[in-house]
Amino acid sequence: GIVLYHRDYREDDKLVKIFTEQAGKLMFFVKHANRSRLNSMIQPLTLADMYLKINDDGLSYIEDIHEVQSFQGINQDLFRLSYATYILALADASIQDRQPDPALFAFLEQTLQLMDRGLDYEILTNIFEMQILSRFGVALNVHECCVCHRVGLPFDFSFRLGGVLCPDHYDRDERRAHWNPNALYLLDRFQAVKFSELETISIHDEMKTELRKCLDQLYDEYVGIHLKAKKFIDSLGSWGEILRNEKNCSRCNGWRSRSTGPSRRGQSSHTRI
């Protein structure tokens, strides 16, 4: 199972939401949690083998936990942690409790593993957002023109048609989105990419901004959920950049003390897809 979140219950107990591979999402009761040996193992973003007592009605119970992985790479970085928390919340919102979904469980685990390894957390989140849309009952066509079915053209998106239009058929929707065709090309790639085939990611910051705009509009139009975790990562755009600059400045100062070469701060951040 993967621990999604926990909250205090009464004075010393906790309710722990766990996404299990076999039984879906369930709420578990942990008595005297702060004094329990399980306390360190029921933190959010914990992956483990769990022995669980699952009741048909009411709360279930954790009997034992083994083989714990706590995603240290994620937990030690505010930005990765924020995005990982968002995809946990997105997975939680996408299916009903007690609804087994081994495919979603595996997809969530793969996303977290790659994020923990240091792959681009923003793009991994974008891929997760695109591929989880089907769990919300949303099926978008970003691969071929909705009218003539041609592929590989500078498409634009039509909210009315739920898909893309080629230049010859832009006139089918006067209120088309006017999105960057390269962003739509990437969204099409994201919709079909398999993590087993993903080795590196390379997308520049300007395109990441375009992708974020497109996905926000898609979720506002077709999904309509407003998660606290999403609001938090949106706020990273303002004060988070200050933290990044301070961190980079600290690294650059240390680097300059060993060399008289140029500063590295001007380099753009990107990885390769």
Where in this protein do the model-derived segments appear?
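Non-catalytic alpha-helical scaffolds and adjoining flexible linkers that form interface surfaces
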Residues: 1-14, 19-255, 265, 272-273
